[in-house]
Amino acid sequence: VWRSVVVLALVNIIGVNLWLGQITSLRIDTTQGKQYSISAATRQYLNQIEEPLLIRGYFSGKTHPMLSPLVPQMKDLIHEYEIAGKGKIRIEFIDPITNLEVEEEANQKYGVRPIPLQVADRYQSAIVNSYFHILIGYGEEFEVLDFQDLIETRAQGDKDFEIVLRNPEYDLTRSIKKVLNTYR
């Protein structure tokens, strides 16, 4: 009897798992403030896209320690745009420092330049050239969001501060709207 119950339970678990595995569009954002959900207004602009839209993130592998946790947050949000774009949005993530040709194109064609950031630890202090930029491209039109557009620094006490994303969905959608309107 126990053996039959265990076998039936396993078969049911496997069956449910296979059934749920086919449901790829089920997405639930349980974060505080729904930081990975895209608003209806953003979805409206994404539905206006007729040609492929490129969202390219330029992020350095080596950056300031306070900036590092923001990179995955931006990448996750950009992935949400790709999903909401229903095949009309192509995303790329590039570290220009690792590829000289890509860095040259970013600098010359799009005006994307690294930001010098001071990093220090217990034993040394150094300047790191870091990329934290988003390129929105539509046809021949493009818009670049840089460090100043995406990041907000908040004071915490006299000497401490916090670096957070300002309002990334608004900034990305505003840039998409701008390139869509300029393209027309």
Identify what each model region corresponds to.
Residues 1-184:
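Short, surface-exposed patches at the edges or C-terminal ends of soluble domains, predominantly
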